[in-house]
């Protein structure tokens, strides 16, 4: 296997909280898939959840080499969790097409947060 993409992003959680306070769920609906949005709505810390997902998707888009736009949408990247809580990443539509162009077959993701920041790193591998 070879690394075909690497991306990292960091988000200030308060910035996301302020946006949610100003605009309600507008950002969440733009960034999160339906399944992610359901979790967001019931989460004990929704702004923290949204910040982590935002960082994860930005990191994934950077690993794909496109950023958000140029055929890759936030909606084309789904961040989930294993039963043990480890984060997972799945690509659809434009993100999957870009991954295929890179000969990528698997994505690895790490997400962390502290009081003020959420950070994510994505590594894409080929076979």
From Swiss-Prot:
Protein's cellular compartments: Cytoplasm
SUPFAM superfamilies: 4'-phosphopantetheinyl transferase
Cofactor: Mg(2+)
Enzyme class label: transferase
Main location: cytoplasm
Molecular function terms, GO-annotated: holo-[acyl-carrier-protein] synthase activity; magnesium ion binding
An annotated GO BP: fatty acid biosynthetic process
Swiss-Prot/TrEMBL keywords: Cytoplasm, Fatty acid biosynthesis, Fatty acid metabolism, Lipid biosynthesis, Lipid metabolism, Magnesium, Metal-binding, Transferase
Classification via HAMAP family: AcpS (MF_00101)
Protein name, UniProt field: Holo-[acyl-carrier-protein] synthase
Species, as recorded: Shewanella oneidensis (strain ATCC 700550 / JCM 31522 / CIP 106686 / LMG 19005 / NCIMB 14063 / MR-1)
């Amino acid at each position: 296997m070879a690394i075909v993409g690497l991306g990292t992003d960091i988000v200030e959680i308060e910035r996301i909280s302020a946006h949610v306070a100003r605009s309600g769920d507008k950002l969440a609906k733009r960034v999160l898939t339906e399944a992610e949005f359901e979790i967001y709505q019931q989460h004990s810390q929704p702004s923290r959840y949204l910040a982590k997902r935002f960082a994860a998707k930005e990191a994934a888009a950077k690993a794909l080499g496109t950023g958000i736009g140029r055929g890759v949408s936030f909606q084309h990247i789904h961040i989930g969790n294993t039963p043990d809580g480890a984060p997972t990443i799945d690509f659809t539509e434009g993100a999957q097409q870009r991954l295929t162009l890179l000969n990528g077959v698997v994505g690895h993701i790490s997400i962390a947060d502290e009081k003020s920041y959420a950070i994510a790193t994505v590594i894409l591998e080929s076979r």
